Amino acid sequence: MKWTFENAKIKGRIVLTDSLHEDPDLLKDKTLYKFIWVDSGEVELDIDHQHVVLKKGQLVPLSHLHHLEFLRIEGKCYALMFNGNFYCIHGNDHEVSCNGLLFHGSSHVLTFVLSEDERRKIDTLTRIMQEEFLSTDQLQDEMLRVLLKRFIIL
């Protein structure tokens, strides 16, 4: 599955997919910030020449500057990606901005272990996002941005 929304006016883009590893064009896009998390099994990644193994319930945030390569996938993982024009240019709070600790706070790859409650919330948010990607009303852009902000806050 792959859901994409693009706002041509501001050149903003947001993507939710469970097949990033099969999409070379999306993998090569150097404008996208990424959240990758494992729903089941484990995923082996190379992130800026650092070997990372993500297991069920783990999430990694990556900036548009990170180089990402999928080495092995055993299970199911998701990626939520967006460019700076979609989210970062909107002057978001420093707690949820693109320039904060989440994306640029360490020289090491940050890995988060999600609690059962956080996993449930992410699952709920991504289901709502999937519905919003299919919507074509005038509020779609803003709704996806609000859902992304909520995802970041989690």
Walk through the language-model features, giving the residues of each:
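Generic protein-terminus/edge-of-domain signal
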Residues: M1-K55
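A hydrophobic/aromatic-rich effector-binding and dimerization subdomain
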Residues: K2-A8, L71-E131
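Amphipathic alpha-helical recognition patches that constitute DNA-binding helices
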Residues: K34, V113, M143
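Residues embedded in well-ordered beta-strands
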Residues: K34-I36, A79, R150
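Short beta-strand His + acidic residue motifs that chelate non-heme Fe in jelly-roll/DSBH
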Residues: E44-D46, L62, H67-I73
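Short, surface-exposed beta-strand-loop junctions and turns on beta-sheet-rich folds
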Residues: H51-V53, V60, K76-C77, F86
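Conserved metal-binding segment of the jelly-roll/cupin
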Residues: L54-H67, M81-F82
